[in-house]
Amino acid sequence: GIHLYIGAQCVDVAIRVIFPGWSDIPYAFAISFVAYWLLTVLVLTRGAGMLKKLESFTAPFLIIWMVVLLVWGRVNAGSWGTLISEPATISGGELRNQMLVCITATIGWWATLVLNITDFTRYSKSQKAHIIGTAVGNPIGFSGLALVGALVTSCSVVIFGEAIWDPIVLTSKINNPLFVVGTLLFLGAAEITTNTAANAFAPCMDISTVSGGRLSFKQAVWIFGVAALLTQPWKLMTSPALYGNAFLVCSGGFLAPLAGVNISNYIFIRKTKLDLNALYDPNGEFAFKRLSKYNKPFTMILYVIAAVLVVLGLVCNKEYLSMTSAMGLSMRLS
């Protein structure tokens, strides 16, 4: 849902640049949101092949866009702003707690891919290929994006007199309509690949699989698309605290037990060895019907404990406890 909102913003701002009167139309953003949601669902119904083609097209552009924004900010501001020279406002235990909250929220953002990364790595040419791609691409890409975001936001304070952290708003302020429209449309396309790959593809596969063949992948996509609307991203994005501390930390806390069970099962019980054929055999050792009498009670125990930890963490303003504790405890129970 969050990526749908961001992508819809790209479309909406691009239309406003081309047609300034667009903002006067009632429910203009709602129209942009529904159109972008429909486009995302249609792309996802085409499967992994379509995602790979679109990702190959948009990923290089994101790197170029980051560099352009960085150069533009530095040239127009004449410096990197106050970010580098400004003294720290927090330290000690408070700094540690805030860092752990940010780390937990970041892990929560990646939680869906942690659980379903095999839906993508199975397309890798080799084990070595996906290990190198993940080890090199993720740290460099994620760190680079964070650094550019911080530096450009700092430059915006000098240029506009206020900190503009939203890259869409910042891009719209560049005095070049053609560049702005082209950039926003590319960003919208990139959001589709990011959203579907990280948050939608794997759950849709799960819905189709759990249905026992009664639902096709395309039908699962439409079901998941409707469910995404129920998260009401337009409300989540009204506050960074609501999005980061509440949504990401809570979702990460509920997904952590699943990751804990998977990790423990693979390392400690299976000793990193799996029977691949049995994984896809409906009557094999991994068949849910054979394990359901054990899964059901333990699933309830894990989720009740995880839910309590999440709520207590938020109530006590110790958000970082929510997911890390849930994951560690689930690994013990498994």
Name the predicted role of every residue range:
Residues 4-17, 61-87, 109, 149-158, ...:
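Hydrophobic alpha-helical segments and their helix-loop junctions in multi-pass secondary transporters
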Residues 144, 148-195, 213, 229-241, ...:
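TM-loop-TM module centered on a large, flexible mid-protein loop between adjacent transmembrane helices
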Residues 17-45, 60-66, 102-117, 181-186, ...:
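Transmembrane alpha-helical segments of multi-pass small-molecule transport proteins
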Residues 31-76, 134-138, 248-256:
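Membrane-interface loop-to-helix entry segments
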Residues 1-21, 191-208:
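Hydrophobic transmembrane alpha-helices that form the core helical bundles
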Residues 13-19, 35-58, 73-74, 116-126, ...:
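Membrane-water interface regions at transmembrane-helix termini and the short interhelical loops
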Residues 258-334:
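C-terminal membrane-solvent junction of multi-pass transporters and transport-like membrane proteins
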Residues 36, 70-76, 88-152, 176-197, ...:
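Hydrophobic, membrane-embedded alpha-helices of multi-pass small-molecule transporters
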